Amino acid sequence: MAKIVDIKGREVLDSRGNPTVEADVLLDNGIIGSACAPSGASTGSREALELRDGDKSRYLGKGVLKAVANINGPIRELLLGKDPSDQKALDRAMIELDGTENKAKLGANAILAVSLAAAKAAAQDQDLPLYAHIANLNGTPGQYSMPVPMMNIINGGEHADNNVDIQEFMVQPVGAKTFSDGLRMGTEIFHHLKAVLKARGLNTAVGDEGGFAPNLASNEDALGAIAEAVEKAGYKLGTDVTLALDCAASEFYEDGKYNLSGEGKSFDAEGFAEYLKGLTERFPIISIEDGLDESDWAGWKILTDKIGEKVQLVGDDLFVTNTKILKEGIEKGIGNSILIKFNQIGSLTETLEAIQMAKAAGYTAVISHRSGETEDSTIADLAVGTAAGQIKTGSLCRSDRVSKYNQLLRIEEQLGAKAVYRGRAEFRG
């Protein structure tokens, strides 16, 4: 049995030029596992705490030297000599050492980086691909699937400097036969969308997640541009390709109102649920994430009752990858899907528990990146190893996004005939 002989933390940069945490876990046989923690822009209020230094003289206060010191000090001392393959024991030990509800003492970014680095080291030690090791940890050995990519090709909200209120407009290649075919379809649509926007005299600069970020007349205008790009790429909207939204509604919710400032409109919960329902009737939108504010559970219930039978309603800020909150949502019939983000909860073990709870309740689980990413591609292995069926990892440019797609291509090649791609069957509704 291999043992952990050293743990090293360091400050590196994410895709927005902000510091984040990287950790190395070294084993007594020379194996090293490395992982980085991502960072979000639109964040749920109940997410685990990302520990920042607050020193305005360094990185505008966003340095992570405190989190790095926690890795190189107490976390290292805690885990030296431990078995890297006992993921649950490692994660529980770090959580207990932290001792807070939201990992505020050590930092979720510190705990997560070590948690993922240990998993990578353990996978190498067992001569397993990371996705296979994750499947074993998940209690589903050998059960894999290739996820349907939800490709964010128009960025708005907190992910772009434009007038579009809805944060993400995504395409899903549900009619593809394989993941690689689906990726090709999405890429072709992305390039056709650039031409569509250029023909309209619109900006084709990209946002945080690699999608285009033009000023548009309305959210519906964004959907119309994508529909045109799908057609020009030679695909049938609603059959080959479907659409998805991430409203990130908490970002434009204030005093009980949903304010679409880009359109000059304001709604109460009932009205905004009706607005979203209208969009699903005019476009083949099969998934809506954070359609209402994270605290507006009454509004979420209205939305779920209105369109939950035919549309996947994903809780991101709503559930923050937290089993306690998810359990309450399941009991109250709120939404029908959970977005899974490692750093919202802060460890691999707790992430797997959230996926398991969702699946047991008939909810889908969508594996997701953050807007502040690195070259770390662990979420690709997580999606395959848990057979989650769906992944959100941005658009078709920027290496911080493409690194995940490229890892999925490698995994598909490794799995061969076992690389099942289920397309539309992965979605609720």
Curated annotation (Swiss-Prot):
The keyword Cytoplasm applies. InterPro entries: Enolase (IPR000941), Enolase-like_C_sf (IPR036849), Enolase-like_N (IPR029017), Enolase_C (IPR020810), Enolase_CS (IPR020809), Enolase_N (IPR020811). It is found in: Cytoplasm; Secreted; Cell surface. Its cofactor is Mg(2+). SUPFAM superfamilies: Enolase C-terminal domain-like, Enolase N-terminal domain-like. GO terms for cellular component: cell surface; extracellular region; phosphopyruvate hydratase complex. CDD domains: enolase (cd03313). The active site is at E209 (proton donor), K341 (proton acceptor). (2R)-2-phosphoglycerate binds at Q167, K341, R370, S371, K392. Pathway: Carbohydrate degradation; glycolysis; pyruvate from D-glyceraldehyde 3-phosphate: step 4/5. One of its GO terms (biological process) is glycolytic process. Its EC number is 4.2.1.11. Keywords: Cytoplasm, Glycolysis, Lyase, Magnesium, Metal-binding, Secreted. It catalyses: (2R)-2-phosphoglycerate = phosphoenolpyruvate + H2O. Catalyzes the reversible conversion of 2-phosphoglycerate (2-PG) into phosphoenolpyruvate (PEP). It is essential for the degradation of carbohydrates via glycolysis. HAMAP family: Enolase. Component of the RNA degradosome, a multiprotein complex involved in RNA processing and mRNA degradation. This is Enolase. It comes from Pseudomonas putida (strain GB-1).
